Curated annotation (Swiss-Prot):
Named cofactor requirement(s): Zn(2+)
UniProt zinc finger (FPG-type) residues: 257-291
Quaternary assembly: Monomer.
Lineage: Bacteria, Pseudomonadati, Pseudomonadota, Alphaproteobacteria, Hyphomicrobiales
Organism this protein belongs to: Rhodopseudomonas palustris (strain ATCC BAA-98 / CGA009)
Similarity comment text for this entry: Belongs to the FPG family.
One GO molecular-function entry: class I DNA-(apurinic or apyrimidinic site) endonuclease activity
Note on cofactor: Binds 1 zinc ion per subunit.
Recorded catalytic activity of this chain's protein: Hydrolysis of DNA containing ring-opened 7-methylguanine residues, releasing 2,6-diamino-4-hydroxy-5-(N-methyl)formamidopyrimidine; 2'-deoxyribonucleotide-(2'-deoxyribose 5'-phosphate)-2'-deoxyribonucleotide-DNA = a 3'-end 2'-deoxyribonucleotide-(2,3-dehydro-2,3-deoxyribose 5'-phosphate)-DNA + a 5'-end 5'-phospho-2'-deoxyribonucleoside-DNA + H(+)
Protein name: Formamidopyrimidine-DNA glycosylase
Function: Involved in base excision repair of DNA damaged by oxidation or by mutagenic agents. Acts as a DNA glycosylase that recognizes and removes damaged bases. Has a preference for oxidized purines, such as 7,8-dihydro-8-oxoguanine (8-oxoG). Has AP (apurinic/apyrimidinic) lyase activity and introduces nicks in the DNA strand. Cleaves the DNA backbone by beta-delta elimination to generate a single-strand break at the site of the removed base with both 3'- and 5'-phosphates.
E.C. number(s) listed in UniProt: 3.2.2.23, 4.2.99.18
Origin: domain of life: Bacteria
Gene: mutM
Disulphide bond pairs: none
Key words of the record: DNA damage, DNA repair, DNA-binding, Glycosidase, Hydrolase, Lyase, Metal-binding, Multifunctional enzyme, Zinc, Zinc-finger
Length: 291
């Protein structure tokens, strides 16, 4: 599933095609995605101008001139492409594998510029929803999300307080969207490696007895920001179904230090990268230098 860097890359790719333009026509070729599209989905989009295109965690959020918000989630295999008025596909700046099978083109936005923004999703785990901007604080998919890891509010103190007293593993805590929004398995593994912290370590060790941040929390916060920032700059990770809107493959996976590198030498200490299953997911780490 695309994580924060992939979704942010998609947002940046769609922004020049959607932001500031009117949706002349919305077409739903298939209404039963992960969740059924609302009966008034097409009507609430048609004729509205996209006044802003943002992101919250792994969700894309398009503000509409009507006061509504269009929430979009890529799911496991969802992708966007932009077909310009001249018929040439120039989907933006991002990298993520998308299906070439047009039978999976489920939703199309025909923009006033003449461009067509097409959502393709073979597995249909993605979804879209329109709701009033006034309800954004209570929207079930957004309610309770933690801070954005690249936002100004996210720092070692905030992370330490969120993890204080937690007896769960550090990796499990970071994957909890209530603790930090948008982090997924790939970048948690990479951030823990950079911070030299074991994924098995208790989350509570990020805070001292006064719930103040320990050195572990400081190192981890910096590592999270670095890993995410580098991944966004590289265009995200092209694993399985992820690609940029331009159709180009991303290349951040080539910078992975431990993820999907089981049995390879650790680039830091020369030890061996190992894999084990943690909370139903593969964890990659170096037991020698992650403590």
């Amino acid at each position: 599933m695309p994580e924060l860097p992939e979704v942010e890359t998609v947002r940046r790719g769609l922004q020049p095609a959607m932001e500031g333009f009117r949706i002349d026509r919305a077409v739903a070729h298939r209404e039963n995605l992960r969740f059924p599209l609302q009966k008034d989905f097409v009507a609430r989009l048609t004729g509205q101008t996209v006044t802003g295109l943002g992101r919250r965690a792994k969700y894309l959020l398009a503000d509409l001139s009507s006061g509504d918000v269009l929430l979009m989630h890529l799911g496991m295999s969802g992708s966007f492409r932009v077909v310009e008025a001249d018929g040439e596909t120039r989907p933006g700046e991002f990298h993520y594998p998308r299906s070439e099978d047009r039978t999976h083109d489920h939703v199309v936005f025909e923009m006033a510029s003449g461009a067509r923004v097409v959502f393709n999703d073979p597995r249909r785990f993605g979804f879209m929803k329109v709701f009033p901007r006034s309800e954004i604080e209570t929207e079930p998919h957004l309610k309770g999300l933690g801070p954005e890891p690249l936002g100004n509010a996210f720092d070692a103190s905030l992370l330490a307080k969120a993890c204080a007293g937690k007896q769960t593993s550090l990796k499990a805590a970071l994957l909890d969207q209530r603790v930090v929004a948008g982090l997924g398995n790939i970048y948690v593994c990479e951030a823990l490696f950079r911070a030299h912290l074991s994924p098995k370590r208790k989350a509570s060790t990020l805070a001292n007895r006064k719930d103040e941040p320990t050195d572990h929390a400081v190192r981890l916060t910096e590592a999270i920001r670095e890993v995410l920032g580098e991944a966004i700059k590289a265009g995200g990770s092209s694993l399985r179904d992820h690609r940029q809107t331009s159709g180009e493959l991303g290349y951040f996976q080539h910078a992975f230090k431990v993820y999907d590198r089981e049995g390879e030498p650790c680039p830091t200490c020369g030890g061996t990268v190992q894999r084990f299953v943690q909370n139903g997911r593969s964890t990659f780490w170096c037991p020698k230098c992650q403590k």
